[in-house]
């Protein structure tokens, strides 16, 4: 084999840095606002961060740009390799649940990138949230690479690398106010059109219900009583509905008591059901919930939401026709 052929036969290696440019910041902004949701990807493969040697650590990431960028930005001044799996542009935690951040893809990516020819060691550092999708035993059996799970948050990696031991605090998955605030734009975009229509036609109650479910709920999440997201949503929705119900009851003192009570009841039925449904959507955005728990919650509470919403709508129409 000639030197030229050997050159082209080397494992493919992409270069990256730990800093962001304007294009990266724009990508982050668009991703947060759900613009081109399928387009926030990096090419799967092996990346060199800084000037790694064959003894440098190997980290594993999803090919969702926010996941990849969170990892590389946390590795300032740490020469290393990043093995990017093809998770179809989905973050680590969600991809682990769907199976794309999984054993087969990890094994395949090790083989395709010929990682064993790039590094002298046989250690991989995976994100903790990727653990549900990967069998470390199976990966070692098929590739001879040992799987090691790093801390829950990429920002703790520099400290973790000193001992390769995660403290209890590093293992704890947090869902801080800032984490919750970053979820609001993408949730808000999905309801922007109905929200605008409701405001234009003057239906302030349902509009408030949507804002409560998409904006207030993630902010107030830790302080709303109960464990289930649905019941939290019902509680928040009832609190939002109460002023509307009181205003409806007091609006026309000359009307019959049953009419005023019915109008108040409309708000107490519609708003909590809408807010609870939107709150339930947040179960997919936090590690506080499990797949089985979410399924139980859906079966338990979605029928209640539907009945409340239907009853509120029917009552609203009925009052109009009776009057």
Segments predicted by a language model, with ranges:
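Extended, hydrophilic extramembrane loops/domains of integral membrane proteins
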Residues: 139-172
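Cytosolic juxtamembrane amphipathic/interface segments immediately preceding
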Residues: 41-46, 170-187
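Core alpha-helical transmembrane segments of integral membrane proteins
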Residues: 181-253
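Non-transmembrane, extramembrane segments of multi-pass ion/lipid transporters
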Residues: 163-180, 287-296
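Generic detector of multi-pass transmembrane helix bundles and their immediately adjacent loops
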Residues: 218, 234-323
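Catalytic or ion-coupling anion/metal-binding cores of large enzyme and transporter domains
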Residues: 2-7, 28-29, 156-160, 169, ...
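Soluble N-terminal domains of membrane-associated systems
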Residues: 1-151
